[in-house]
């Protein structure tokens, strides 16, 4: 049986599509004309849908806006507890025989059990009249069924989050319609099933959700079975990850699935001003979790744990708070139905005593989303937005390297705001187009980039904009671009991804421009580091900054870390006489980082169950590219294979390369018909790429000088006059030095000479 087919394929299959944003909260079932005719349904008829994953939902039949057959869209506003419509990954289609037209007579009275927002407890905890009014408003003109749950639409105001239908008359019918004459009452017994919360889509968090679900659902649902088996289950879980990746959202979703009462507390909010107040607040929160556990499984979520439990030092108040939390965590292990979940973006700042078994037994790391995960997140966010069919979410995912879930939400919100402002002038119904997302990119930067040292917002450069150097371009693509884009082929051939590349050659030969083009083609982060970013008057600060740069680059992978003019940052250790030179210490840190660059176990994201997910894991590394025009002063340990695997010589352009560079430089320049780029290329021997661009600039300025500001063309005579003033920056002696530099050293990884 195909994994996406219905288990009862006796009827026509309808493909289950995501709900249109305009139909949220309407309780509609969108069907094609053929399906409506087969059911004999009229507009607004009540339809009961039996779901493949169990449960059912009650909707009203409505035609699809595009009139297409073979598709179905559901709004499960009224469904049985635990029913899963859009969350199923194993089934993507429904048999038409699962849709049943049911009678829906008006109801005289209905009894409901309300689920209040903010976990207010029993209905009597708040004004009964206000709760009853909110329940009547939620049920008005809706078909309902006994035992089903009516969930408030997303974003709807009011006290009530959901209503359990616990009674109604007449009861023999499978469904009934709540009319203005229907008497709604609060009564009955609360259902034994977990009180539902609005479904939280987990775009890009599936693997972390599986890990957390495994740790939480077993002790919460099967505590006695685990005790009988003699298994000690973890009572505490620590979530670690950068801000905005969805730690809180993940906990809420898993708590909903496990049917647990969630008590979410921000740790900084527990801080008190007077002595002992913080400890008192912490004890009160744990006591509240125990009270909730008396009614069923309870989950205590402590956000920003590093603010509450930093590493203990000489400050007595912090030590007392940490000791109190440790005592309460040890006591919570005796409460079988209380699970404590902590979240932090600084796990190293926590006191080590918290992270031992028996307290926070397990740690679940949520990293910056990968390409596949960003696409899933964008699909979840835009499913509620009217986006144009021209918007390519895959392309947006490629453009959002380093964006976390909160950044992507802000990006979509900014695009929606731009579309709204644009629609006031052109149309009544705003539609988010590709241009709106491009405008939003100007205002929304990824949060993981905001504190990165040396991060550059580079101007995109295409390979075609770099004249000549075809052999060098191919070598760079093979060394860096191919491993990022075709990792499966590399593994099949037994190849490993290079860790680093050294570009060396005369000044002005496009070393930096080549790296910019490489970063553009690979769609990766680009971090450029110079000596000014590293060196500090304080001892040990430079080494710390370099380690921080590598750590931040790994958090923004795939990334290219560009060490421009590396000779000014590092030197050869043999040239240091004191043995404690700062460049020598920085070199030591760089060598250690190069040996350790790659995918750490705690940073792993995605799985290897498919080729695309394997590519996500393979790309979790930082590519080091260094550039210098003085390779003779570099330490030989840096140049061995395994660190800077490839040493590529960037030669000055030959005749063909100079002609290509001149064409690129004069592409936007109004040159006259008498200009012969072929002759200019022949006359510019020993000119670097920077020299040729300077030559074209001087010729254009000379044309303005001779013909005034009204000059329209640059003629051949202007180029010839500029040749008399612009001299080449290279010589035969310089070229011979670069070409023979590594030959005598015997390096096997030098290319391009």
Curated annotation (Swiss-Prot):
PROSITE patterns recorded: AAA (PS00674)
SMART domains cross-referenced by the UniProt entry: AAA
Region (Required for interaction with AFG2A and CINP) location: 1-189
Record EC number: 3.6.4.10
Effect of residue 64 to W: In NEDHLS; strongly reduces interaction with AFG2A and CINP; reduces cell viability
Regulation of its function: In the context of 55LCC heterohexameric ATPase complex, the ATPase activity is stimulated by DNA binding and inhibited in presence of RNA.
GO biological process: autophagosome maturation; mitotic spindle disassembly; proteasome-mediated ubiquitin-dependent protein catabolic process; retrograde protein transport, ER to cytosol; ribosomal large subunit biogenesis
Cellular location(s): Cytoplasm; Cytoplasm, Cytoskeleton, Spindle; Nucleus
Outcome of swapping residue 66 to Y: In NEDHLS; reduces interaction with AFG2A and CINP; reduces cell viability
Annotated region described as Disordered, given as residue ranges: 171-203
Alphabetical keyword list: Acetylation, ATP-binding, Cytoplasm, Cytoskeleton, Deafness, Epilepsy, Hydrolase, Intellectual disability, Non-syndromic deafness, Nucleotide-binding, Nucleus, Repeat, Ribosome biogenesis
Assigned GO CC terms: cytoplasm; cytosol; nucleus; spindle; VCP-NPL4-UFD1 AAA ATPase complex
Coiled coil: none
Enzymatic reactions: ATP + H2O = ADP + phosphate + H(+)
Residues that bear N-acetylmethionine: 1
Similarity-based family: Belongs to the AAA ATPase family. AFG2 subfamily.
Function (record text): ATP-dependent chaperone part of the 55LCC heterohexameric ATPase complex which is chromatin-associated and promotes replisome proteostasis to maintain replication fork progression and genome stability. Required for replication fork progression, sister chromatid cohesion, and chromosome stability. The ATPase activity is specifically enhanced by replication fork DNA and is coupled to cysteine protease-dependent cleavage of replisome substrates in response to replication fork damage.
Disease the record associates with this protein: Deafness, autosomal recessive, 119: A form of non-syndromic deafness characterized by mild to profound sensorineural hearing loss. Sensorineural hearing loss results from damage to the neural receptors of the inner ear, the nerve pathways to the brain, or the area of the brain that receives sound information.
Assembly notes: Part of the 55LCC heterohexameric ATPase complex composed at least of AIRIM, AFG2A, AFG2B and CINP. Associates with pre-60S ribosomal particles.
PANTHER family in UniProt: AAA-FAMILY ATPASE, ATPASE FAMILY GENE 2 PROTEIN HOMOLOG B
UniProt name for this protein: ATPase family gene 2 protein homolog B
UniProt organism field: Homo sapiens (Human)
Gene (name only): AFG2B
